[in-house]
Amino acid sequence: MISKDHLHHLDPLGTTKSYHMNTSTVSPPSPASSISLSQSAWLEVRLFYVRIAPCVVENVPDFLTLRHPRRETGASLEVNGVRVPSSQTASLKLRRDRVDRESSEVTYVSTETVRVTGCVDFEVYDNEDMVLCGNLDRIEGAWNNGTVSDPKTGWGMDCYIAMGNGHVSGPSASVFFQPKFGVSSPSVEVYIAGCCGGVPVILTKTIQASPRRKVARHVTLDAIPEDEEVGKEQDIGTIGDELARQSKVQMMESEVDEYDDSDMKMAQRYYPEGMYVDEDGQLSWFNAGVRVGVGIGLGMCLGVGIGVGLLMRSYQATTSNLRRRFL
């Protein structure tokens, strides 16, 4: 046992302070409170439901695949009580539950128990074609930007229509997005039911697939030469050629309606005068007639001019002869 004098000898200025904790006043957390705190952070999903309408019910698959891709640090995932490492992808089956031929809709359901914490993404596939994607996350009410959330627990869901093979762009080969079957913009409803800390949680969202929009078309016309100096007959021929020439219009479009696969098309347009152009590009009989008519007109003008000149010359000669006689 150390005496007070010995302590004073070790610290004569009395700078050493001793702290005493009354352990009788601090009680350890009860097991029930620790369990409730840990369970309140988990969202337990007991039902995952997807409804798609309209669709071609004769071609819909028997199963869809629900995937939870790799997650970031801090996000946990359990499937039927088994922890899934964050570096691995979990896959579940969505079985076809109901098909309504009158309303052309189909429903897929999964009743596997899935528990998540943090932000966990999910993806729904038809074979290798993504149908939709989204995420589950616990968010604050102030940051709710279009996300469906539960006001009591704070858990929210956001989802989007996926139009391509594992991507959110490009045409999809899924049977749910096939314009040739008359289905290009179906409505997809996602429904999740579960609980968080003993509080029931229901999240549902309906998303509508819309046809892709066209972008502005860039039109380029061929330049018309203006600085060439030619003769009168060549000018007349050039005018006729310019009236009959065709204009190539290049349409640059990155997206087309009904998920068309082509991104660039070349089309040829004609001026109204182009109807007088044959398939081989030569002048038609109409333009040839115009040329002949212009030539005839010029010939007539030249003939009249020559005739008037000869008449004037003969008149002058006659006048001079008469003057000589009278003089």
UniProtKB/Swiss-Prot annotation:
Region entry Disordered, spans: 12-31
Residues passing through the membrane, by range: 183-203, 292-312
Gene Ontology cellular-component annotations: membrane
Membrane topology: Multi-pass membrane protein
This protein's record includes keyword Kinase: no
Domain of life, per lineage: Eukaryota
Keywords assigned by UniProt, alphabetized: Membrane, Transmembrane, Transmembrane helix
Full protein name: Uncharacterized protein At1g01500
